[in-house]
Amino acid sequence: MSKEKFERLKPHVNVGTIGHVDHGKTTLTAAICTVLAKVYGGDAKDFASIDNAPEERERGITISTSHVEYDTPARHYAHVDCPGHADYVKNMITGAAQMDGGILVVAATDGPMPQTREHILLGRQVGIPYIIVFMNKCDMVDDEELLELVEMEVRELLSEYDFPGDDCPVIMGSALGALNGEAQWEEKIIELAEALDNYIPEPERAIDLPFILPIEDVFSIQGRGTVVTGRVEQGIVRIGEEVAIIGIKETTTTTCTGVEMFRKLLDEGRAGENVGVLLRGTKRDDVERGQVLAKPGSITPHTTFESEIYVLSKDEGGRHTPFFKGYRPQFYFRTTDVTGTIELPEGVEMVMPGDNIQMKVTLIAPIAMDEGLRFAIREGGRTVGAGVVAKIFE
């Protein structure tokens, strides 16, 4: 069977459903696929095939995730849905499925529940930029005032975690009704699709962002100088441009005098490419793995930050015992390990394998970072946790 060519004619946006258990995330995912396929064309997916989510491994962590795709006239969407709460936590923290926007599903019959709050908080911590609310099961609520009350509660909850609660679109619908082909509820799915198109801006492509290349290796080439190699994370580097070397040591700037790929000389290196960059007047010992090459001024080195962490369970190959304050593991950023100390939240004495928690981390050497950067927690090369930078202190 030949693979059909993927036509990238429309902008591509990543979204996903979040919210409390049994509020209808998977049913909504199936309803979106079904209704949009019916109205705009495409493949419908049924509930069972989405609910039966395959297991994936991301940085050694087992996560069950379903990926579906659907189209509106304006865009192509990739949508992730997770069967269990733990899968959401892991997914958001590892960034296994990056979201440009989230669809928060809240059952009108229950209103916001503990996981509703937890998913909103996680969304804030891991940098999901936009949230659209789908109030589900509205066909089971007769009281108009009750619906308004739930909407108000959800908006207040979003505002509490720094989302624009007053401005987030709220769509009142019934995923099951739409899945069963009831016209009034199908219309609400179309309304949700329009909200996705209008409320979530088109994500910036990696190539349009400022240049960053995490350094993997450093070579000295006789008569030509020092070459650093790695995969361009974002942006473009061109010959003759100034680049900064950031992290671990004092930041320095130099000039890119050459770019090569597979021994061919290029004018530029672009996001996603594995390249070697030749640096003017830089000595072999001035640069090391773990630093990044970046557009000067675009990213800064830091040592102290607030993070959201998932600790691997014993079954996932993580620790067998809890850890306490004063724990000093290595934090693996991009290409290297840096030792750091942790500070647990007030009232938390210990952290068990399988937990997720916020903690303040202080590294012994600075690393080039922005909020939203993912890292692994390791002990002697073995991964015991995953985390994301939520807020930078210094």
From Swiss-Prot:
Binding annotation for Mg(2+): 26
Entry's Gene Ontology molecular function annotations: GTP binding; GTPase activity; guanosine tetraphosphate binding; translation elongation factor activity
Gene Ontology cellular component annotations, sorted alphabetically: cytosol
Keywords per UniProt: Cytoplasm, Elongation factor, GTP-binding, Hydrolase, Magnesium, Metal-binding, Nucleotide-binding, Protein biosynthesis
Annotated localization: Cytoplasm
Segments of this protein annotated with the region G1: 19-26
Annotated stretches, region: G3: 81-84
Reactions catalysed, as given in the entry: GTP + H2O = GDP + phosphate + H(+)
InterPro entries: EF-Tu_GTP-bd, EF-Tu_GTPase, EFTu-like_2, EFTU_2, G_TR_CS, P-loop_NTPase, Small_GTP-bd, T_Tr_GTP-bd_dom
Location of the region described as G4 in the Swiss-Prot/TrEMBL record: 136-139
EC number from the UniProt entry: 3.6.5.3
Region (G5): 174-176
Domain tr-type G intervals: 10-204
Class of this enzyme: hydrolase
Binding site for GTP: 19-26, 81-85, 136-139
Main subcellular location: cytoplasm
Region (G2): 60-64
Subunit structure: Monomer.
Family: Belongs to the TRAFAC class translation factor GTPase superfamily. Classic translation factor GTPase family. EF-Tu/EF-1A subfamily.
Function: GTP hydrolase that promotes the GTP-dependent binding of aminoacyl-tRNA to the A-site of ribosomes during protein biosynthesis.
Designated name of the protein: Elongation factor Tu 2
Naturally occurring in which organism (per UniProt): Photobacterium profundum (strain SS9)
Gene name of this polypeptide: tuf2
